[in-house]
């Protein structure tokens, strides 16, 4: 058998994704179930412990296939966006909802309960968080969750930034964080 990288292939000695049958050894193989990240950002760890190494972070709206859950509130699976495999709090997972249509394009964006920036923010979203926009309300995009986000902070999910240097410059001064994917801490990869 070819050695596969367990950071991007969902297998451990006790469990593996069904599509890896014949490629890895495991006590059992499972199909997995799709879920969606419902927290703005959540840690994806090497082992099911809050003290475990951070391998990456999952952002709001990302989809993840879950292969195992524990009674202690952990879930083990693989992110669809970058393929990373790891453990995260099962509280950060929800049912697959509306397909994200837009992503946050600034380092941080507030979402509000209504179309007014004077309202208390409902949540702060990191760059790359994905939301399903259902309509416009003045200068705000309204999401399937009922949040109002200033539309200037969003772009269609498939849109790519043409000037990656300008995007990187927005993060000058951001501290290094192994596995980090937000303006609170970034990994070099």
PLM features per residue range, with description:
Residues 37-40, 46-49, 68:
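Extended, low-hydrophobicity, Ser/Thr/Pro/Gly-biased non-transmembrane segments
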Residues 35-38, 53-54, 133:
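Hydrophobic/basic alpha-helical segments enriched in Actinobacteria
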Residues 44-48, 56-60:
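Short Pro/Gly-enriched beta-strand edge/turn motifs at strand-loop
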Residues 175-182:
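Second-shell loop/turn segments in exported
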Residues 1-33, 49, 62-65, 72, ...:
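Boundary regions of SH3-family modules and the immediately adjacent low-complexity/disordered segments
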Residues 168, 182-189:
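Active-site nucleophilic cysteine motif
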């Amino acid at each position: 058998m070819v050695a596969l990288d367990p950071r991007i292939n969902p297998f451990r000695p006790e469990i593996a994704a069904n599509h890896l049958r014949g490629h890895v050894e495991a006590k059992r193989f499972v199909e997995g179930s799709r879920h969606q990240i419902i927290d703005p950002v959540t840690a994806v760890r090497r082992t099911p412990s809050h003290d475990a190494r951070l391998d990456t972070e999952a952002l709001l709206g990302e989809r993840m296939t879950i292969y195992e859950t524990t009674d202690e509130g952990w879930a083990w699976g693989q992110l669809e966006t970058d393929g990373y495999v790891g453990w995260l709090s099962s509280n950060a997972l929800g049912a697959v909802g509306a397909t994200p249509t837009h992503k946050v394009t600034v380092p941080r964006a507030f979402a509000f309960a209504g179309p007014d920036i004077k309202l208390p923010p409902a949540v702060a979203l990191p760059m790359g968080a994905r939301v399903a926009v259902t309509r416009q309300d003045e200068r705000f995009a309204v999401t399937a969750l009922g949040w109002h986000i200033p539309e200037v902070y969003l772009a269609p999910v498939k849109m790519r930034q043409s000037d990656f240097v300008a995007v990187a410059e927005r993060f000058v001064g951001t501290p290094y964080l192994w596995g980090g994917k937000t303006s609170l801490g970034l990994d070099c990869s």
